[in-house]
Structure formats: C-alpha cells, structure tokens
Amino acid sequence: MMRQERSHTKVIATIGPITRNKEILEKLIHEGVDVFRVNLSHDLHEEHLKTITYIKELNEELGSNVAILGDLQGPKLRVGDMEDDKVMLEDGQEFSFVSTPCTGTTEKAFLSYERLPTDVSVGERILVDDGKLIFEVTGSNLTDTVTCRVIAGGPLSSKKGVNLPQTKISQPSLTEKDIKDALFLLDHHVDWLALSFVRKEKDILDLRKIVEAHPNNARIIAKIEKPEALEEIEGIISASDAVMVARGDLGVEVDFHKVPLIQKDIIKKCHNKSKPVILATSFASALVGVGLVIMLSIICVATITGFDFI
C-alpha cells in the first residue's frame, strides 16, 4: 500500500513485455521500486496475471511490500492501421477521419470514436501522435466522416494516439473495457486502480461503486490529463484516494507552458486534503542517451515540488 509520509519521493515502475520477468522484477525491487504499474491499455489479462503473480510471489519470498497499480485505459482514442504502416501527410492538404473501420491512406484514417462526427465542431483541432500532427476540422456529415485541413503534417503511423483538446467528448470516462478490466484486477487483489482521462467527480464515483460492490478493496487514483478535469479538480481530489498528473497527455491538451503551474496548484490542493500526488511521464524513453545527471535532476524537481510518487 502506498505510504504518505514524505521521507522521500517513491518510485512507480511500469511493467511491459521486457520487464515481465520474475528475475527482472526482483532486481527492480532491490533497486527501490515501491509500486509496480500494469497498463491495461495493452496485452491480455493472462499476461497481466503473470505479472501480478510474480509480484505477489516476490513479496512473499523477499518480505517486501511492493504495491500493484492497475491502470485502466479509459476512452483513449487512436487511429487504425495505416497503409504500409505509415503514410506521409502534407501541410494544407485535405484529410478525413472516419468511424467505419478501414485501412488508412493519405486521404483518410479510421478513428476509434464513433461519436466524433457529432461531438466535434468546425474550427476545432484534432491532434495525433502527441501533437506532432495537427488537423483543423472543416466539416462533418454527422454520421461517419469528419473532414479536416492538415495544419502540421508528417508521418502518420498505425495506432497513434489522438487528442481532442477543444472538443467536449460525450463518451464516458469509464468504458465497458474499463469495467471488465477493473473486475479482473479486483479479483486478483491489486492495491490501486487508476482511471484515465477523468473529466469530472462522477467518473471517480462510478468506479467507486464497482469497487465497493466487490469483496476485494482497492484504492482509486484519478489521472488528470484532460482540461475538463481542472474545472472540477476539487471534487475529483475529494472523491479519489490519490491523484496522478499525467504530464504527457495534459501537455498535449493544454498549452505545455501552463503545465508547471497546473501541477503546482494540484499538488497544493492534494496536500491540503492529505491525498498523495503522483508525477507521471515517460522517464525511461525521455532519458535514453541523456544520462544520470538529468535523471537525478528530474527526481530532485519532483521531490522539491511536492510529488509523493514518480
């Protein structure tokens, strides 16, 4: 279980295919990992169960108390498969997002959100691949197609994530997949459930009902990565057991230079309510080739600014 005393900033490590190995997990525990995160956006339940089982076995063998955090996918939007896995889009060209499954081309791509044609408005922007590609909505047929103009082009690859920073999404934050995943995680006694793309307090309360109806308990983390969440941040913090500032998606959804002030405000509000606050970002990939000094600097910043976990 996560500890709230601030003797040092605790470490959360995400487990993937490479680290889903008992020997590697043991090394990570010896290196000081406090929480292992399993990401339900990827892989089958059978693979995640292997990870959970290994962690529980190691806790028993080592006398450790490393917690398990199950991260629910939420309504993450992605494009479908692209022709030859990648196409090149030019600035100024026309492009369409469609809700009917298809192989993407230089003219259109499937987007895994059937309500997009009715949710978006002309002039709103659609961001792909963490904002590397930018599209401006020029029209919608209100059924299955949204037409756009490419503002910032480049390579569009299969399965890239999509952000709609100006669009009020009607899809619930807690999806059918999330409910199934949450029940699986509860069945196997994980310590924490993280809900992605939280937009309002009700999102947390809906997940809380599922947890309370299950014989096994778990604490709930609200992941802050949508600007709508900032409008109800007090209620979200109150309804949650901890809060995670997901800098990656949040930095795409709002002006990146605003993120430090936003996270500072969230930290203050969390500490006022005695709720742990977590800094989430892709440290490993960001630090490739950068070196230990930068990594230590990030950890120092996380500690000084008041994050309980990174």
Language-model region placement:
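Non-catalytic helical/linker scaffolds that mediate oligomerization, partner binding
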Residues: 1-310
